[in-house]
Regions:
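Charge-rich amphipathic alpha-helical interaction elements
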Residues: 1-151
Length: 151
């Protein structure tokens, strides 16, 4: 190919940015899944603890023990509320990361399309030059044969 793609540095930069956006999106998705798992764990733990409270109530509890169960359930509820907010925040971060990835990918595809078009144009030019060389060679070959026939 005669001419190098003039936007190759930009194409390389866009590829690097897209790779970084992909890596970052992977981290955001993993963080969101981790936050969801923690929330699920807290909700399961609360359900188990509430079941223990009901079982203890059927067997009889002292007012102090009942208060301890209720206080602990309130703390678990607070933790669930905080973790729910963390999940919401993590979802927003993931959505933002997806938008960033889409934008970087869109830019990369635009530059990559230009690169492919450039390569195609260069191949067409190269093919025309090769054809011209072959045609000239063929003309010379027949011209030499024609001179031999005249002699």
């Amino acid at each position: 190919m005669a001419n190098k793609f003039s936007l190759q540095p930009l194409l390389d930069l866009m590829q690097t940015r897209t790779d970084e956006a992909t890596r970052q999106l992977g981290l955001l998705i993993a963080a969101e899944q981790s936050a969801r798992n923690r929330l699920q764990m807290l909700e399961d733990y609360r359900a188990d603890y509430a079941t223990k409270l009901r079982d203890a109530c059927t067997q009889g509890l002292t007012p102090m023990a009942l208060r301890n169960y209720q206080d602990f359930l309130a703390r678990i509820d607070d933790a669930i509320s905080q973790q729910t907010l963390a999940v919401i925040h993590s979802k927003q971060n993931t959505a933002s990361g997806q938008e960033n990835w889409k934008e970087q990918n869109k830019r990369l595809k635009a530059i990559d399309t230009r690169s492919h078009r450039h390569d195609l144009r260069e191949r067409v030019i190269d093919n025309k030059q090769q054809q011209k060389i072959q045609d000239e060679h063929t003309v010379r070959k027949y011209a030499v044969r024609g001179e031999e026939d005249v002699d």
